[in-house]
């Protein structure tokens, strides 16, 4: 084989390989990629739930909450929060934000799957109360619904 022919063949092969690689990398993402595990699916569900919470989407938020959930607040209080109360909070709280830093599956305990959400919550009320907290919030899920939340303050 002539050396010029060999170089031309290598160039054709390299170009065709690059085209194949390029077309493989530019294929549209599949919308219905199966979840890798139930744990991953729960984390994705939690991501969607927190997004709905921040957007004050009461319908989506309420769907994932049982009639009332026990909240162990970072300030030491233990309160029952009803779905209606949570929706009222979302509607009536003038200013709040929740900067999510991470959402991770923690494990399974007492028949519940637990997901931790780490982030910064800021709320201000018309009466002057202001909350600015870095929290780790553990959400216990059972049967596709949030049944309990435990909050811990953390340093950034």
Predicted features by range, described:
Residues 95, 123-131:
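Short, cysteine-centered beta-strand-loop-beta hairpins and adjacent loop/turn segments enriched
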Residues 28, 132-156:
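Short beta-strand edge/turn micro-motifs at domain boundaries
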Residues 111-121:
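A short hydrophobic beta-strand element
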Residues 86, 100-107, 120-122, 134-140, ...:
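Hydrophobic/aromatic beta-strand elements that line small-molecule binding cavities or substrate pockets
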């Amino acid at each position: 084989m002539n050396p010029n022919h060999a170089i031309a063949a290598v160039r054709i092969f390299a170009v065709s390989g690059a085209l194949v690689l390029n077309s493989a990398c530019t294929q549209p993402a599949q919308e219905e990629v199966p979840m890798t595990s139930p744990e991953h699916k729960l984390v994705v569900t939690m991501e969607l739930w927190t997004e709905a919470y921040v957007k004050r989407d009461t319908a989506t938020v309420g769907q994932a909450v049982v009639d009332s959930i026990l909240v162990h607040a970072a300030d030491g209080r233990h309160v029952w929060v009803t779905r209606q109360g949570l929706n009222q909070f979302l509607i009536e709280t003038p200013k709040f934000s929740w900067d999510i830093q991470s959402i991770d599956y923690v494990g399974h305990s007492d028949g519940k799957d637990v997901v931790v959400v780490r982030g910064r919550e800021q709320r201000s009320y018309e009466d002057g109360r202001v909350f600015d907290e870095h929290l780790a919030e553990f959400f216990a899920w059972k049967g596709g619904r949030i049944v309990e939340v435990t909050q811990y303050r953390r340093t950034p």
